[in-house]
């Protein structure tokens, strides 16, 4: 269906501009309020190489107001994913995250913590907002749906989404919110 409000460009997203790929530079310079939805099965890392080239390419993110992105293959792209997120978090607030339950978890870090192998994240540009408070909403929310209906949902619970260290007398426990053996919901003070 053709509509004048939309322009469909038959190119893959990547690091370079070619006849078959775009790094979105032209569009990111041309438009000032971009909503970017990207689910390109690992190709986000090639696009990140372009974004991370220099300060001028990174600053193109100022023209993007929202990003909905699926990040893939943390089991093999772990360091690239961390670098990509670090860059995006300089410009954006993460307002939603959902683990793709079809892809389970990445290989555990050396410290034993795990994270989703594939996850969807929604980001809003910081320039559009004053300082926002962290949400106490549990993830997944009632609006989320499983990617695969017959698999268990993947839980992050509430902010902050990192492992918590619990000290009890002389013992120290690392509690991971990512469907570890500590999968139940509970609260505690650190």
What positions do the PLM features span?
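Rossmann-like AdoMet/SAM-dependent catalytic core
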Residues: 2, 7-10, 18-32, 59, ...
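Distinct, well-ordered alpha-helical segments
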Residues: 22-23, 44-58
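Short, Asp-centered acidic motifs that coordinate Mg2+ and/or phosphate
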Residues: 35
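Switch II (G3) loop of P-loop NTPases
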Residues: 39-43
């Amino acid at each position: 269906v053709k509509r004048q409000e939309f322009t469909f460009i038959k190119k893959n997203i990547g690091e370079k501009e070619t006849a078959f790929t775009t790094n979105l530079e032209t569009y990111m310079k041309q438009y000032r309020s971009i909503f970017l939805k990207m689910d390109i099965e690992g190709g986000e890392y090639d696009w990140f190489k372009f974004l991370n080239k220099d300060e001028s390419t990174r600053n193109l993110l100022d023209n993007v107001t929202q990003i909905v992105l699926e990040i893939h293959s943390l089991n093999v792209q772990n360091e690239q994913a961390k670098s990509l997120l670090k860059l995006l978090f300089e410009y954006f607030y993460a307002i939603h995250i959902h683990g793709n339950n079809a892809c389970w978890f990445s290989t555990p870090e050396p410290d034993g913590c795990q994270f989703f192998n594939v996850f969807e994240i929604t980001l809003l540009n910081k320039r559009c907002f004053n300082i926002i408070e962290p949400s106490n909403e549990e993830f997944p929310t009632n609006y989320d749906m499983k990617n695969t209906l017959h698999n268990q949902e993947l839980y992050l619970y509430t902010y902050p989404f990192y492992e918590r260290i619990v000290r009890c007398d002389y013992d120290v426990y690392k509690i991971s919110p990512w469907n570890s053996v500590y999968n139940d919901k509970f609260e505690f003070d650190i």
